[in-house]
Structure formats: structure tokens, C-alpha cells
Amino acid sequence: MLLFDQDELDYHFKQLFKFYRCKLSGFSFHTQKLVGTICINYLQNCYLNQEGEYREKAYELIDDLALIPDLGMFRIIKNYYKYWFNHDSIKYRSIRKFLIDNGLEEFVHRLP
């Protein structure tokens, strides 16, 4: 069930980006995790809707997360989407294999 169409998602994501860009790593772990989750959800909706003008902004916000292991999966999944949208099958398949090799098949089943 979709709550927003792609235009509404883009609008709300733009607001999120404006607020958190270049300073996200200074927020609490909980806030960073929430924003990372929203970014991944936005990328998934871009895939489902085959559009989304703020994909690069989602990548940027994820790159602004603190460099701690607990947030590392966001970067891995971000790279998967980035390679998938850029049709770099060698790289996104290597991430897919990495996830499977590490027992994370559940992630793979949810990815494009």
C-alpha cells in the first residue's frame, strides 16, 4: 500500500534533505538510523515507480551518516541501488553475492 505518489515522495524527501544535509552525522544514532531507513525506502520507491528525481540526494545523505559499523549496512545497500540504477550489473551482483555469502538472503529478496 503506497501512502504517497512519487511527486509527494520527492517533495517530502527534498525537505528531509534540506534539513539534514552536511550535518547528519552530528545527530543521534536513532535519528541517523531513521534517516538512513527513509533513504533506502525512498530508493526502493524510485525502483518501484521507475522515477525519482532525488536519488543522488539519498546517496548523499547516506554518505553523511556517521562512519560506525551499526550504520554500515545503509552504505552497502545504497551502493547496491546506485549500481543497479546505473546498470552496473557486475558491481550490484557482487554486493548481492556478498550479502548471500554472509547469511543476509533476506536483504537480497527485497532488492531489485
What is each stretch, according to the model?
Residues 1-48:
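Mid-protein regulatory/catalytic core that forms ligand/cofactor-binding pockets
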Residues 6, 49, 85-89:
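Structural motif corresponding to the intra-repeat A-B loop/turn of tetratricopeptide repeats
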Residues 24-29, 66-76, 101-112:
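Boundary/linker segments of alpha-helical solenoid repeat arrays
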Residues 61-80, 84-88:
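Long C-terminal appendages of proteins
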Residues 82-112:
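C-terminal non-catalytic interaction modules
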